[in-house]
Amino acid sequence: MAIELVTKFKGYVDEQFSTESKKSMLTNQDFDWTGAHTVKIYKATTAEMNDYDREGTGSNWSRYGKVQGINATTEEMTLTKDRSFTVATDALDADETQGVLGSASVLARQNREVVIPEVDAYTYGVMCADAGNKPAAVALTEENIYAEILKGNEALDDAEAPETDRVLVLKPSTYTLLKKCPDVVMETDIGNELRLKGVIGLLDGCKVLKIPANRLPADFGFMIAHPCATVAPTKLESFVVHHNPPGISGYLLEGRVCYDAFVLDNKAKAIYYQAQPAT
């Protein structure tokens, strides 16, 4: 007697793991690109201090010292990343896969697994490349990692970067080294608001973020940054669903994201990037 065994399909999708963006902890939105593709900001110089010539015996006509000029130059930020995607889903496929290929599911998956990781990786790459403090590459170990982090914070102190809201970025492997370091006492009693943003602790006054290695440069060791240094605008983020467009029975999904990241010249010293030797 032949018996046909039942096969069941569940409305569950084996989704890929993906991490939410932590970019907002490291960057700012201080400038508005609405109605413009390029934003220019001014950089101004200052004057040196002099000893006041109270007796008027100096060679300058002014007792205040030699009159100096002030220069004002511009810093230009032009958006360069204009990215897009398009995908079609058949009407029957959407109906017969228990919603797995529904337009809302497809767009959410694309944004979560492709768009956000790309924007993050680009932004972190710009920050590392344009950091104002980039010492020679060092092989990080559990014995030296804490000392290297202290050097980074010291560099930001010497650059007079703001002491509050600094962020220490680690990839999982360097975070493991840090946890093994006997000198480290990380403060983990932090508020729920910071935890929801991805902060896992506080170290030497820095909020500690752990970011997947695939969103960071290959030689990444760690980075200390203040959000004032990097502007990361997203000028356009458009996702459109067309129902039964010409030539397709189903849905045509289109997305476009225009974004970029810029490290400000006078604030680059608020980023310390420690690379590791290439392996």
Predicted regions and their residues:
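Short Gly/aromatic-enriched secondary-structure transition segments
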Residues: 54-62
